[in-house]
């Protein structure tokens, strides 16, 4: 009703941008008439106009017109009008919802270029290393052509490389790299170690994945803490002995377990202890984790075992996350369950959530195919508006009604039958599954039916071929099984992706001859040591010993035809020429990937190696296109890509992402969900209603049920889950917000010290406040002065400031409280000047170094302890909800007290340490524990 009266708010927003679109289109002929050099000189011109006081908004039409023309020349891609709209929405600091295949990656070049003109840096965030590298190589060419520098951050880069790349005008990186660099920068001991520049503007690709799906997971940098291994092993044995329902209850919804009274008694009996919570010998934590590991963490669903280690599988993307570990001893409990070596537990040194990390940017924007369902959350937490960008062509996708089966096996048989039917008809099929385990069940069924298919899940042998598999998922009769949204960012083109195939063919010949052995490549060695599991786009691995040896050979059935002799000769000659120029196996892998990327595009180049490779690439592509174009037309006639969902996800948004794979850019396509009454979503959130329905439907197993009530139940369950998780995220955000204010304060203080701003004044301020604290502790203004304990007070002052050994209580006798404080301020300043002269006599400037060292040391040590105290506080206030107190209010007030105590302790410890400091390394005296 309101929409009819007021008009669609989204349309109103888009209308606002229309005049700029018209102006950019009018500028197009003028831009096309410019030479390359004239087009490139526009960048300097824009920068000068900004210096003269012009705003970015005033420059927007011409700057966008320049980028559009540069992209046409360099990449052969011209921005559609809807892509210009997307660019304006991003420049305004909003979220642009653009459907799959509408060229989101190209859209980001517009606001990135415009905002980079300020010289303050722009960061483009993608969800994995492979996409960051692909976009930096591909879209980076437009920016480089226009004279801007482009940086790329990869998982294994050393700090100097990171610094150099962050200093570029535009930097491509993943969300986790930015997050961990931010935390590491705030643990640096000198400015030379800091890699990030101040945050300015950031565009997040797949913004829903980063700001919503991953918002619940904090980023944590931790240090090792030794804990007794046998405790984990005994706890696992006890968990195995305890019975579900009788000894403990499982809350799948909250992913938690609760021991019953019988459970506590049984565990204490088996362990031979009186109390699981005994502070001298605590067991509760170990037992809870062991039961969680037994009931809630399933092999091949939540984790896989690789190389004798537990590797986490990301529940949202289905990708493995090497190097990440669950905290609080949970990872160790799972290692014990699986009989693997138990590694040390970790202690948090620094932590932040993505929510608070990205709120540090003064200007933030994002793009995704699916944001509208979470619009309220984006606006509430991030103050980000969502604007839907219309598609360039109307979609040709049909969403067919869900079919529901009584049990899971019947559902899988039906999915396999549908795959077989479409495969026979020549239509490509993409099946989305929710776990590694499920994808393998379906794969077995298809093998039994003799249907060739590609499997894409978190297993290491599949990850490396990820984009190769996705790029060919649109071939005639292709059947592809993918876990969740693996392969996000690679388009499924009907009939196959000729550009991608040609690039693979060039890599296959070029890489083995040109890439230096891993032992000579420091980046590659770092990746091996850190266990890089990111889809690097490196195809084809042949096993050799423990470490697979790279071969770069793509599977032969990828290519639609063998190359003609002339084309193969051309490719070999180009590779020989490259080897002659660079030397055999002489350049690092990332650099070689860059050469292939540039050769596969249209950017003007003076490099003879790239020119020769490009000539070969173009010829290979045109040979492949003869086949793929023909196949494209056939597949379109058959009805396009058919997408099958095999379970409703916890969020409707993830379902929509899967559906969005079909019918890109106006192609035909269809989607259907196959469900069973045993699916997690229905089981956990659909509750008893579904159980009742199961009994009501007295049907054969293989008969599908189509029912309005059931579909309603599903929608309801999804809404419930979305609300449930939104509440959790909101709670995480509210609690973390308390920590966030404290984190900002402590990191700001730390940065001032790192930059060496007025260190002496800072320490003197610490000393004066410590003197004030001592006076307040010993002097009660409500009592007559003769009752003040001046002896003890002077004793305490001397403990902190040993250079005031001559101070006598009589000197303070006739002073008021305020005068005492003033007197001690003077005394401590005199003492500090003496100390400084004494230290600087040994080595000039040593006192400043000592100040920096002690302040940083105290901040880091006490902040680490504070994080643990805040964690413990958060757990304990949770229980107060039962006592009619608001846990959040309690957490805020007590957390603030803890923070003030920490700041006081930092000040006192620094003052004490500096006055005790003896560079000849004499052992310092015992530190006084408290002012009183």
Swiss-Prot record:
It is an enzyme of class 7 (translocase). The keyword Membrane applies. One of its GO terms (molecular function) is ATP binding. SUPFAM superfamilies: Helical scaffold and wing domains of SecA, P-loop containing nucleoside triphosphate hydrolases, Pre-protein crosslinking domain of SecA. One of its GO terms (biological process) is protein import. ATP binds at residues 83, 101-105, 491. Disulfide bonds: none annotated. It is found in: Cell inner membrane; Cellular thylakoid membrane; Cytoplasm. It catalyses: ATP + H2O + cellular proteinSide 1 = ADP + phosphate + cellular proteinSide 2. The keyword Electron transport does not apply. Monomer and homodimer. Part of the essential Sec protein translocation apparatus which comprises SecA, SecYEG and auxiliary proteins SecDF. Other proteins may also be involved. Belongs to the SecA family. HAMAP family: SecA. This is Protein translocase subunit SecA. It comes from Cyanothece sp. (strain PCC 7425 / ATCC 29141).
């Amino acid at each position: 009703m309101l929409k009819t009266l007021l008009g669609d708010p989204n349309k109103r927003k888009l209308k606002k941008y229309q005049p700029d679109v018209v102006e950019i289109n009018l500028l197009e002929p003028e831009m096309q008439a410019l030479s390359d050099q004239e087009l490139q000189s526009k960048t300097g011109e824009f920068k000068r106009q900004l210096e003269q006081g012009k705003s970015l908004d005033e420059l927007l039409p011409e700057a966008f017109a320049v980028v559009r023309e540069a992209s046409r020349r360099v990449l052969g891609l011209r921005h559609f009008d809807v892509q210009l709209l997307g660019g304006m929405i991003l420049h305004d600091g909003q979220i642009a919802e653009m459907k799959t295949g509408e060229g989101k990656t190209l859209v980001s070049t517009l606001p990135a270029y415009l905002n980079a003109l300020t010289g303050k840096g722009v960061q483009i965030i993608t969800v994995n290393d492979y996409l960051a590298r692909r976009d930096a190589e591909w879209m980076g060419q437009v920016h480089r052509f226009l004279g801007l520098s482009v940086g790329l951050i990869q998982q294994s880069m050393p700090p100097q490389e990171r610094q150099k790349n962050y200093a570029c005008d535009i930097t491509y990186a993943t969300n986790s790299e930015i997050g961990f660099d931010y935390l590491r920068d705030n643990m640096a001991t000198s400015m030379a170690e800091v890699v990030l520049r101040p945050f300015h503007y950031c565009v997040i690709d797949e913004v829903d994945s980063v700001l919503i799906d991953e918002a619940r997971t904090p980023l944590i940098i931790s240090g090792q803490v030794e804990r007794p291994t046998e405790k984990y092993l005994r706890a696992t044995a006890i968990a195995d002995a305890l019975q579900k329902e009788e000894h403990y209850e499982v809350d799948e919804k909250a992913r938690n377990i609760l021991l019953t009274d019988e459970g506590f008694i049984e565990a204490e009996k088996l362990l031979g202890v009186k109390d699981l919570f005994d502070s001298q010998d605590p067991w509760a934590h170990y037992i809870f984790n062991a039961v969680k590991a037994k009931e809630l963490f399933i092999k091949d669903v939540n984790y896989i075992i690789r190389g004798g280690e537990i590797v986490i599988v990301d529940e949202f993307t289905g990708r493995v996350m090497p190097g990440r570990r669950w905290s609080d001893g949970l990872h160790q409990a799972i290692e014990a369950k699986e009989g693997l070596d138990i590694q040390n537990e970790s202690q948090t040194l620094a932590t932040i959530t993505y929510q608070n990390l990205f709120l540090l940017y003064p200007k933030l924007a994002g793009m995704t195919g699916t944001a509208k369902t979470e619009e309220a959350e984006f606006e509430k937490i991030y103050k980000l508006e969502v604007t839907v960008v219309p598609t360039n062509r109307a979609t040709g996708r049909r969403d067919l009604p869900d079919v529901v089966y009584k049990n899971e096996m019947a559902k899988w048989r039906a999915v396999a039958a549908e795959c077989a039917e479409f495969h026979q008809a020549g239509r490509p099929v993409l099946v989305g599954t929710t776990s590694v385990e499920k994808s393998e069940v379906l794969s077995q069924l298809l093998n039994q039916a003799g249907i060739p298919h590609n499997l894409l899940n978190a297993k290491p042998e599949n990850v490396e071929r990820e984009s190769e598999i996705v790029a060919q998922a649109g071939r005639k009769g292709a059947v592809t099984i993918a876990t969740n949204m693996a392969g996000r960012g690679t388009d499924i083109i009907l009939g196959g992706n000729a550009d991608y195939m040609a690039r693979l063919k060039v890599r296959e010949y070029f890489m083995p001859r040109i890439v230096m052995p891993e032992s000579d490549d420091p980046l590659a060695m770092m990746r091996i040591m850190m266990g890089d599991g990111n889809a690097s786009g490196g195809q084809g691995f042949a096993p050799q010993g423990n470490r697979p040896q790279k071969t770069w050979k793509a599977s032969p059935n990828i290519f639609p035809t063998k190359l003609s002799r002339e084309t193969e000769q051309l490719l070999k000659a180009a590779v020989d020429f490259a080897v002659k120029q660079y030397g055999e196996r002489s350049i690092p892998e990332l650099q070689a990937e860059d050469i292939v990327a540039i050769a596969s595009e249209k950017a003007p180049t003076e490099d003879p190696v790239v020119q020769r490779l490009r000539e070969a690439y173009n010829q290979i592509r045109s040979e492949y296109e003869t086949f793929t174009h023909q196949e494209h037309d056939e597949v379109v006639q058959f009805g396009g890509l058919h997408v099958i969902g095999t379970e409703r996800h916890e969020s409707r948004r993830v379902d929509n992402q899967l559906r969005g794979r079909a019918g890109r850019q106006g192609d035909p396509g269809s989607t259907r969900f196959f469900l069973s009454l045993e699916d997690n979503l229905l089981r956990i959130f659909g509750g008893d209603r579904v159980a009742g329905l199961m009994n009501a439907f007295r049907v054969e197993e293989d008969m599908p049920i189509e029912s309005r009530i059931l579909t309603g139940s599903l929608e309801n369950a999804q809404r419930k889950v979305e609300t449930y998780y939104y509440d959790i995220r909101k709670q995480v955000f509210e609690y973390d917000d308390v920590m966030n204010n404290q984190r900002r304060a402590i990191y700001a203080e730390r940065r001032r010290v790192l930059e060496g701003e007025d260190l002496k004044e800072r320490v003197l301020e610490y000393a004066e406040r410590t003197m004030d604290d001592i006076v307040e502790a010993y002097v009660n203004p409500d009592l007559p002065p003769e009752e003040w304990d001046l002896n003890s007070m002077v004793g305490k002052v001397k403990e902190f400031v040993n250079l005031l050994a001559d101070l006598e209580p009589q000197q303070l006798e006739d002073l008021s409280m305020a005068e005492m404080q003033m007197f001690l301020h003077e005394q401590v300043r005199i003492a500090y000047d003496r100390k400084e002269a004494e230290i600087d006599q040994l080595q000039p400037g040593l006192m400043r170094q000592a100040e920096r060292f002690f302040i940083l040391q105290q901040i880091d040590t006490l902040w680490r302890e504070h994080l643990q105290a805040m964690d413990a506080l958060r757990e304990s206030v949770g229980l107060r909800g039962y006592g009619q107190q608001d846990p959040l209010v309690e957490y805020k007030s007590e957390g603030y007290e803890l923070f003030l105590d920490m700041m006081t302790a930092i000040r006192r410890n620094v003052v004490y340490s500096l006055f005790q400091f003896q560079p000849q390394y004499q052992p310092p005296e015992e530190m006084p524990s408290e002012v009183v």
